[in-house]
Amino acid sequence: MNRKLTLWGLWIFSVSLFYLLCPPASAQTSPKREFRAVWIATVANIDWPSAKGLPTVRQQDEFINLLDFHRRTGMNAAIVQVRPATDAFYFSAQEMWSEWLTGKQGLMPEPYYDPLQFMIAETHRRGMEFHAWINPYRAQFEGDSLRVHPEHITRRKPEWFVTYGKSKVFNPGIPEVRQYITDIVADIVRRYDVDAIHFDDYFYPYQIQGQVFNDSATYRQYGKSFAKIDDWRRDNVNRLVEAISLQIRHIKPYVKFGISPFGVWRNRSQDPRGSATQGGQTCYDHLYADIRLWLEKGWIDYVAPQAYFSIEFDKVPYKTLVDWWADNSFGRHVYVGHAPYKIAPDGNDPHWAKPTQIPEQVRYNRRKNGKVHGSIYFSSKSLVRNPNGVADSLRTNFYKHTALLPLMPWKKGSPPPPPSGLEVLPSKKGALLRWNPPPKLTATENTAKYHAIYRVKANEPFDLNNPAQMIALTGTEGFFLDDTFPADGEYRYAVTALSRMHHESTAVYSHAIRLRAPGAWTDFVITLINTYRQAPKNGKKQ
């Protein structure tokens, strides 16, 4: 046992040493704009909450700790699963509270709070986007029918569902089903300040050998104009995606719509437009999700292909897959999905044991000449676990410098007015920045939503295009505590405002200031700020 522990300790030491000595080239070429996100899964309590039925304060503390960890790692967006299986992590008049939140389906949190409202506020406060992750078709997860509430939609509308394997899913061919799901999405967009609606890869279910998806009667009723049931199924999903896209744009045109499909659209052996891969199941042929069409039609704003394969995997090589998506995005954004959950010394693919696997994937993304716009990691707990030091590598190298999110030129927007009145007060806790945020504008998409903080030594010029000078993104509050500067010296700061769509204003600049130990007044101000941030508002914890 001691020998095993010693060998394990040596392995951990070797991995840590690798990242300490890793050349900083990637950090030096870090782009100013890059999407950096993490999936936070709630189904089966994969990432959050850590268990069913936790007290409200414990749930909130856990989520805040996750956000703080991922922001320190360099993330600028969180993709949180708010509807894992036709249930809700928010107040809904249509669907039940999730059992993975409260321990029992239909039971509200106690003490009461709205988790979605809380998560959005905390995410925005940290200068990060919040993408509401929804599973459109999954209704029951792996045979949990005994725990289903009597008022659950599967009990009220049993004719809408198909049992397949251990799960129950909506029948996509029924028009009322498509309308129901569209209404669910519209309700979230209308009532919550989400930055995006996000679907994952679950459309028609992954096929199980020897089992039939029993929708033949629905096909006979609604699919008469289609000679093949496969084409009809694809059309059903197309109709849903188009309807949701139109609904989002009608309610809040600035809200994005993104989808994270399985990595392979089609193999080239099936379609000359497909990738040079040998995927066992594909989006188009098995899940009936024609993601390439949705990009071509402009129905979605970004695609996040789940490229959960190593660079060396012969059947679906990572680089081959990324090349295909980069060349078939039709001008929309590509955020590549990475698989830190696969990192293990004894996994099925030995190449995942290499500490360089995900770092090399990120490097490759950045070499795609602007055709790949960022990365998403599945999932939160894998980054927190930090296998092979992957989170350390992101924090200290690839994401060492803060990044703004990429612009979407097809969406309306312009820079907000700049902030004003920037002051910097020294303190033993750091440098306290205070400024006046710009006024709100009539056009919501152009109102300041975030602020970017820049810092240089007093004798250096500002270059706001240099990501090394940007030290933080924060929310709309007009203050920031910088505790990252060297212990002594003179510095200057700049602050810009960013619109909801991340258009950046001109900057307001500070005078040079020598950072020394503070006076009692500055520490008092910092204490007041911290108290303000933690205080209940309107009698409820935010």
Pin down the residues of each PLM region.
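Active-site-adjacent "subsite" loops/lids of carbohydrate-active enzymes
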Residues: 41-61, 132, 137-191, 285-289
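Catalytic domains of carbohydrate-active enzymes, especially glycoside hydrolases
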Residues: 61-87
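Active-site neighborhood of glycoside hydrolase catalytic domains
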Residues: 176, 180-184, 190-199, 203-277, ...
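Substrate-binding cleft of secreted/luminal carbohydrate-active enzymes
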Residues: 288-292, 296-314, 330-410
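Pro/Thr/Ser/Gly-rich low-complexity, intrinsically disordered linker/stalk tracts
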Residues: 389-390, 394-445, 502-533
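Solvent-exposed loop/turn segments flanking beta-strands in beta-repeat/beta-sandwich domains
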Residues: 438-465, 490
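Beta-strand-rich modules
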Residues: 482-504
